[in-house]
Curated annotation (Swiss-Prot):
Protein's membrane topology: Peripheral membrane protein
Family of this protein: Belongs to the TRAFAC class TrmE-Era-EngA-EngB-Septin-like GTPase superfamily. Era GTPase family.
Chain positions covered by the region annotation Disordered: 271-290
Residues of the KH type-2 domain: 360-437
Region (G5) location: 308-310
Protein name, UniProt field: GTPase Era, mitochondrial
Region annotated G2, chain positions: 146-150
Species of the source: Homo sapiens
Subcellular location: Mitochondrion matrix; Mitochondrion inner membrane
Transit peptide: 1-43
């Protein structure tokens, strides 16, 4: 029997040492395993001509996918496969993605399908929820408004069921679109997506005191025009409410006290909490209110109500299972290996834009133009991306680069990590800043 190699002996010794300290401490000690296994560093972010690399905060076994033998040996907990079973990656090659999108669906005989539209105010958390339902981040997420600029499509395929998610921009008024010179897609896409919807998910951020007390007039008009489409209410970030009585008031207001054709039963001793600005749970007959009635602040035709907490994945699992059960017999629209209809370049541009929104102040990120100069596979199979960031002011250049290049380095590092998780390959990303003349 051949003697074990030096690398194999070191690996066994390291694994045993990690196993002895326990999985919680072990997570911070597993990073060096990549060198023991002979793996290359998974992400190198090169910014404005200066090399930048940061350690990947995950075990080396992640490079071979979830649920590896190394994780099981170390006692690491595995993700719930019932929430995100076999989540496909997105190809970094546009031609491969295009071929996959037109490939004949590999559906079973008893296939079922459901098209779901997510509607809500800007920054309500629609893209975050979409990513959670898909099991992989493919849509940009930011604390700033209008991160989603146009309709984006994601696909959930489990067993015989396929759910198609349409993540839309936050609904805005025509006046706001003109006043802020926003793209027309922000105004039109939520309405267009309703034309092919089987179910509408209305998302409300209950932590936002300015928007949580009522559905916007634009959203109510959209629901009224397509009233034949079933809808459900999802109240997001309920863990942010310190007093749960506020949650009851909001539920009564947003549903006009009616869910699935039945009036909500509230205790007579229930009183409004100061500062919520919600009406009494006692409401009029919803059928007697006209569409243009200024007193209408809710929608009395929701079939179900779901409450999501950022602290619990079980809430997302419950919503996902509901969507799967609502699917009707019909042919799939996509192959089971499809996760999103976006091109790799679109995903990359959106992710970088997300980081711009997160790291740049006020109006600056909205005035940055992105131009991809290089998109190719490197000699080691890594994805090489070079993108130019074009700005109209010298002051924007300084803000984007930051002291000693810190800001643009951070943007590239975070974008590279996200893209790695999307494409499941090494990513070499280079960003440069140029002043528009």
């Amino acid at each position: 029997m051949a003697a074990p190699s030096w690398r194999g002996a070191r690996l066994v010794q390291s694994v045993l040492r990690v196993w002895q300290v326990g999985p919680h401490v072990a997570r911070e000690r597993v990073i060096p395993f990549s060198s023991l296994l002979g793996f290359q560093r998974r992400c190198v972010s090169c910014v404005a001509g200066s090399a930048f690399s940061g350690p990947r905060l995950a075990s080396a076994s992640r490079s071979n996918g979830q649920g590896s033998a190394l994780d099981h040996f170390l006692g690491f907990s595995q993700p719930d496969s019932s929430v995100t079973p076999c989540v496909p990656a997105v190809s970094m090659n546009r031609d491969e993605q295009d071929v996959l999108l037109v490939h004949h669906p590999d559906m079973p005989e008893n296939s079922r399908v459901l098209r779901v539209v997510l509607l809500g105010a800007p920054n309500a958390g629609k893209s975050t929820l979409s990513n959670q339902l898909l099991g992989r981040k493919v849509f940009p997420v930011s604390r700033k408004v209008h991160t989603t600029r146009c309709q984006a499509l994601g696909v959930i395929t489990e067993k015989e069921t396929q759910v198609i998610l349409l993540d839309t921009p936050g609904i805005i008024s025509p006046g706001k679109q003109k006043r802020h010179h926003l793209e027309l897609s922000l105004l039109e896409d939520p309405w267009k997506s309703m034309e092919s919807a089987d179910l509408v998910v209305v998302l409300v951020d209950v932590s936002d005191k300015w928007t949580r007390n009522q559905l916007s007039p634009q959203l109510l008009r959209c629901l009224t025009k397509y009233s034949q489409i079933p809808s459900v209410l999802v109240m997001n970030k309920v863990d942010c409410l310190k007093q749960k009585s506020v949650l009851l008031e909001l539920t009564a207001a947003l549903t006009e006290g009616v869910v699935n054709g039945k009036k909500l039963k509230m205790r007579q001793a229930f009183h409004s909490h100061p500062g919520t600005h919600c009406p009494s749970p006692a409401v009029k007959d919803p059928n007697t209110q006209s569409v243009g009635n200024p007193q209408r602040i809710g929608w009395p035709h929701f079939k179900e109500i779901f409450m999501l907490s950022a602290l619990s994945q079980e809430d997302v699992k419950t919503l996902k299972q509901y969507l799967l059960t609502q699917a009707q017999p019909g042919p799939w629209e996509y192959h089971s290996a499809v996760l999103t209809s976006q091109t790799p370049e679109e995903i990359c541009a959106n992710i970088i834009r997300e980081k711009l929104l997160e790291h740049l102040p006020q109006e600056v990120p909205y005035n940055v133009q992105q131009k991809t100069a290089v998109w190719e596979e490197g000699p080691g199979g890594e994805l090489v991306i070079q993108q130019k960031l074009l700005v109209p002011k010298e002051s924007y250049v300084k803000l984007l680069i930051g002291p000693k290049g810190h800001v643009i380095s951070q943007i590239a590092q975070e974008a590279g990590h996200d893209l790695m998780d999307i494409f499941l390959c090494d990513v070499d990303i280079r960003l440069s800043v140029k002043l528009l003349k």
